[in-house]
Amino acid sequence: MSTFVNDTVEDAIKTPELDQPFEALGLKDDEYARIKEILGRRPTDAELTVYSVMWSEHCSYKSSKVHLRYFGETTTEEMASKILAGIGENAGVVDIGDGNAVTFRVESHNHPSFVEPHQGAATGVGGIVRDIMAMGARPIAVMDQLRFGALDNPDTQRVLPGVVDGISHYGNCLGLPNIGGETVFDDSYAGNPLVNALCVGTLKVEDLKLAFASGTGNKVILFGSRTGLDGIGGVSVLGSASFEEGEERKLPAVQVGDPFAEKVLIECCLELYKAGVVVGIQDLGGGGLACATSELAAAGDGGMRVNLDNVPLRAENMSAAEILASESQERMCAVVTPENVERFLEICAKWDVTCAEIGEVTDEKDRYVVVHNGEVVIDAPPSTIDEGPVYNRPVARPENQDELQLEGEIARPVDVEEIKAAWLKLVASPALASRAFITEQYDRYVRGNTVQAKNANAGVLRIDEETNRGVAISADASGRYTKLEPNTGAQLALAEAYRNVVSTGARPVAVTNCLNFGSPENAGVMWQFKEAVHGLADGSKLLGIPVSGGNVSFYNQTGDEPILPTPVVGVLGVLDNVEQSIGNVLPSEDNDLYLLGETFDEFGGSIWQQVSGAGLNGLPPVVDLLNEQRLADLFVGSDLFAASHDLSEGGLGQTLAELAIHADKGMDVDLSQIHPSLFTSLFAESASRIVVATNRGEELEKRAAELGVPVFKLGCTNDSAVIAVKGADVEFTVSVEELREAWTNTLPEAFGHAVGANAVVA
């Protein structure tokens, strides 16, 4: 038993005027007053800690709830019919047919990754994997969305190697393939990097698990790693506040991960599920035991009593508040019927997983009681802990938004040599250069079910070895577009993720998101947030695919400067047969090349605008989601395509370069019908476009015409190792080797040819 002297409920009643450090825990004056009103007294230290954790921005969504409701308001019955678990659960779960379900979610670990890059990123992977485990699923793959400051910024040089090393170390040790992602460099992320991790898992429909505590007398069992002092205050210290300059040393609030412990925990959980001994389950992530137990209690049909004296600890004399707020990793909390406790403990012992019975479900409805050292340190309604306050914060369009949307001048090369130089400059830019320097550290093919990963439009995985049924997943975002017009920016992210999935031949079925924004106390940021939510919700409704869940990360700023608003959007698609999926590597034999979709003179927020020094201004490309649907109708179930590659940042020039580099193929292309300006044809970033390779051009042209998809023949591939480009009145050539050298050298040169302990440079 701990020798720590607790502040008990009895003490709180006797000392009502005791000063408490509620502000240091992130609570406002009115929130503290509300807690006292709920309890009818001052809170104990443990109660104050639990309320501060659960009412933090990270856990309560108190500034975003009023806007997130719009996702539910725009979800039709038809859209919701395939969602087995949606918004509010640990992860969205989608019924994909044949008794199979897929769960996926993306979550942020931004602030911890700035403070301690390796552990912050590693535990971000571990946390999202446990979210998937808590749904009753086996995790099968991860992805990541990373944002850093400018490539030459000293802070980027400090943070990126640790983040990449953390992701690769944890994911590789778990034996989970990393099947895709994005890495973006922009000044706005200096001092506040974004580390968003996505995980996907599979399960049988009947094996779905949910987070609730029901059944009076059922036991609450904590299992996994022991509880220590790491990560205390993570969600309130790091997840709910912005950084000031020089605040990178908030180390006590950063969790420490052990991937080998999590790997064992995965197998232990799966055996527990198979044995049928779990009534409800919750992972321990942000908010630790305080969050897990209070959420289980709030979602159940009774109350809960927890005895902290039974919690396995790895530090001596921990207070009740410390035990509850600890964010030690690799822990789960389960509700188990009394008759199944023995079997539960046996399975944990088999896997050498530490476990302990720490409480039980009671018949005291909406009562959450916690005991430590034999004394009651918490006695509160769990519903008030779980629900938290809801703020409808001021929303105001920024005063400079109109000025920002004015189209500025950009350099427009006309001379052949200038256009060629611009092309090489673009592919070599930090925005578009090869990410192999990073991704080669990730194991993409472990488990043997990865069909597409490296340089693919979307990650493709087989989930059923007998039927070859599979899924395609893509996650995308553009902070530059969203800064210019948040509603359109969010829809462009949705459109790109949707198009990436479609270009593999998969049928999109669901959406997830991670919304990364600045301070919610800034009315301009809240306008960006509201507009982005509405854009994403309206876009998902138009496409007919539901938002199955998501995450919000506020306070992403350094001082008063917020990051670019960055709504990361993930789309999940289903493939009936992964062997028929469409890749993005040109076949060895020559094929005709076609461009699907129209090209307009759209450079607002483009990479060319950034690389040419024109800043950020204008309007982003027009998004037409009906055009995206027409592309889906053309691709899903089709066998017309030998390869495909969507167009996004960098436009057609970037797509042609990547196709040629990956296959070491040359090509002859005539762009005179794409746009009168060769420069615009190559570098504009119009949406709803895909380049395809096919030897069945006439069939493609006929089918595209039937669906209303604009189609332009570009030319054909060859073995010349040269791209020959023809415009309306100019022609030039560029060798594939020139493009490859420009594309591959940027990151290795910037980081001295090594990133982290696991670096393997291709």
Curated annotation (Swiss-Prot):
* Principal subcellular localization: cytoplasm
Name the residues that bind substrate: 108-111, 130, 255, 327-329, 553
Q: Its GO CC terms?
A: cytoplasm
Q: Where does Mg(2+) 1 bind?
A: 107, 551
Reported EC number(s) for this entry are 6.3.5.3
Q: Name one GO molecular function term.
A: magnesium ion binding
A Pfam family that the UniProt record links to this protein: FGAR-AT_linker
Q: Which family does it belong to?
A: Belongs to the FGAMS family.
The entry's protein name is Phosphoribosylformylglycinamidine synthase subunit PurL
Q: Which organism is it from?
A: Corynebacterium glutamicum (strain ATCC 13032 / DSM 20300 / JCM 1318 / BCRC 11384 / CCUG 27702 / LMG 3730 / NBRC 12168 / NCIMB 10025 / NRRL B-2784 / 534)
- Lineage of producing organism: Bacteria, Bacillati, Actinomycetota, Actinomycetes, Mycobacteriales
